[in-house]
Amino acid sequence: MIHLFCLSRYRLYVKINKKVIKMLNRQKNDYYFNIFLNLARAMYMQLEKDWDKEAKLCGISYAQQHALWLLHVQDGLTLEELGNIAIWNKSTTSALISRLEKKGLVEKRKDEGSRLIRIYLTEEGYKKIDESTNTKECIEYMGLFKDKEEEDVVRVLSLMKELVDEIHQGKNPDFNTFINEYSQN
């Protein structure tokens, strides 16, 4: 009788401990996610602020600079591909490209034998990218990883990509293709 009581008490203890462990794991996961979210937001907000300041010195907006940079990396994107990679909606992407086209920084070309229209940097667009990324601040930002061990950089970037993949869950194939191709270079 005492033996059965101890056994059932042990089962209750194990059941309670599993609940406590599950609760603690949930709290730990919530804590890590909160830290991740705040770090990601802080990094994004500061980078956007600084890149916007640099872009304005060159007479373009942060979004325009971002579009030019994406086209510099992968020229000939369609409006849809560019919007998906930059995570912009169609109207934002279209308006942005129209403004860049008026400034003579990009041009649209129709694919031969297709209805697709692709966007390409003009000579002026390439010059604007050079101008907007050759400032002291931009060079410092782009050199963030120069003093880091390559395996640490690869590990951090791989983890970030893994997290983005989990968040996107395959919802943005253009973004995934761009990141995969860019990370191969």
Name these PLM-found stretches:
Residues W69, S98-R99:
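Core alpha-helical elements of the protein kinase catalytic domain
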Residues K49-T92:
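N-terminal helix-turn-helix DNA-binding core of bacterial DNA-binding proteins
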Residues R99-R155:
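Charged, amphipathic alpha-helical coiled-coil/dimerization segments
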Residues M1-C58:
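N-terminal leader segment of winged-helix/HTH proteins
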Residues N134-N185:
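Terminal interaction helix/tail motif
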Residues N38-R41, M45, K49, K53, ...:
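Generic detection of well-ordered alpha-helical segments
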